[in-house]
């Protein structure tokens, strides 16, 4: 039995690409169901499908997934489950968007062309091939706390920058097997579609993303190093999807390892080595006052996410 399943909150990361011409009409029923069942997190709806991460009781999440699966034309979403000791979200948001994952390139359609899916159990063999180039499609702050052995860091701040990186690094990809990965798989749907559209044929991506790999591949067989950043209050997870000791800098929202917190530039709620030089003394004074109010609120038993 998965020891993590004893934790009180079930976290579901999901996405599905499917034509949803009437996606606006789906927003209110989803929001009502989530609020009625104590579910929190974010769901994105667009004409191309649905994407999001939510948390709640196991029964509540089961109701939500049944509702989503029953949406006409949508079908079974790609799902990754994990568990949390505390509710990892502060509120519930259902948003209408142009894209369910923002790449900013017109005409990219994973339903028409996408890379070859590689199951977690087969991933190690693919990336060990000397003719394979491994590309981390995530952002630089995600790469910084964990990635696969030998993976290239495109040093992007947002996914919108990824297409330009590919164009500028074609020579590193030519004649190679291109193996891409991301947190849960959705960014790779568009990344592999984009790369294939440029004429590359041997394009692969990790099915279910890092989360599925960490869930299914035993630690002793794993070639993952570090933690996997997640976009909720857990901040990061490790092998077996266990909660990690990575925290967020509340000034810039970069992930911080225990080692990062030893920096002379780290002050809780005020700055870290990554953002100290980016902020003015006035900014830091303002953050310090906010942190003071957060601590006072915690002492009173108020919501601990004030200022987060």
Swiss-Prot record:
| EC number, UniProt record | 1.14.-.-
Among Pfam families, the record links this protein to:
Rhodanese (PF00581), UPF0176_N (PF17773)
Which top EC class is given?
oxidoreductase
InterPro entries referenced in this protein's UniProt entry, alphabetically: Rhodanese-like_dom, Rhodanese-like_dom_sf, TrhO, TRHO_N
Q: Which GO terms describe its biological process?
A: tRNA modification
Q: Which Gene3D superfamilies match?
A: 3.30.70.100, Rhodanese-like domain (3.40.250.10)
Catalytic reaction equation(s):
uridine(34) in tRNA + AH2 + O2 = 5-hydroxyuridine(34) in tRNA + A + H2O
Which superkingdom, per the lineage?
Answer: Bacteria
Give yes or no: UniProt keyword RNA-binding. Answer: no
Active site feature: 182 (cysteine persulfide intermediate)
Q: Where is the Rhodanese domain?
A: 128-222
- Key words, A-Z: Oxidoreductase, tRNA processing
- Does the keyword Iron-sulfur belong to this entry? no
Q: Name one GO molecular function term.
A: oxidoreductase activity, acting on paired donors, with incorporation or reduction of molecular oxygen
State the family named in the UniProt similarity comment for this chain. Answer: Belongs to the TrhO family.
Query: What role does it play?
Result: Catalyzes oxygen-dependent 5-hydroxyuridine (ho5U) modification at position 34 in tRNAs.
- What's the name of the protein? tRNA uridine(34) hydroxylase
């Amino acid at each position: 039995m998965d020891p993590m399943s004893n934790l009180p909150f079930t976290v579901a990361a999901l996405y599905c690409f499917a034509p949803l011409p009437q996606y606006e009409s789906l927003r209110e029923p989803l929001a009502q169901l989530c609020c009625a069942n104590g579910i929190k997190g974010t769901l994105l709806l667009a004409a191309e499908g649905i994407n999001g991460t939510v948390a709640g009781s196991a029964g509540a999440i089961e109701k939500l997934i049944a509702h989503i699966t029953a949406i006409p034309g949508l079908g079974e979403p790609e799902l990754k489950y994990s568990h949390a000791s505390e509710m990892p979200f502060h509120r519930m948001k259902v948003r209408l968007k142009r894209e369910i994952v923002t790449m900013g390139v017109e005409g990219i359609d994973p339903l028409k062309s996408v890379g070859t899916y590689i199951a977690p159990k087969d991933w190690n063999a693919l990336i060990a091939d000397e003719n394979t180039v491994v590309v981390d499609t995530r952002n630089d702050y995600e790469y910084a706390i964990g990635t696969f052995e030998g993976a290239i860091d495109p040093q992007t701040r947002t996914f919108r920058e990824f297409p330009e990186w590919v164009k500028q690094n074609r020579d590193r990809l030519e004649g190679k097997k291109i193996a891409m990965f991301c947190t849960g798989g959705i960014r790779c749907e568009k990344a592999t579609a984009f790369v294939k559209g440029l004429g590359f044929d041997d394009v692969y991506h990790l099915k279910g993303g890092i989360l599925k790999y960490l869930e299914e591949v035993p630690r002793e067989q794993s070639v993952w190093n570090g933690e996997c950043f997640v976009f909720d209050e857990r901040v990061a997870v490790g092998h077996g999807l266990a909660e990690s000791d990575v925290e967020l800098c509340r000034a810039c929202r970069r992930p911080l390892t225990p080692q990062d917190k030893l920096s002379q530039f780290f002050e809780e709620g005020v700055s870290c080595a990554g953002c100290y030089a980016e902020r003015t003394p006035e900014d830091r004074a303002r953050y310090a006052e906010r942190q003071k109010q957060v601590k006072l609120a915690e002492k009173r038993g108020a919501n601990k996410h004030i200022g987060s």
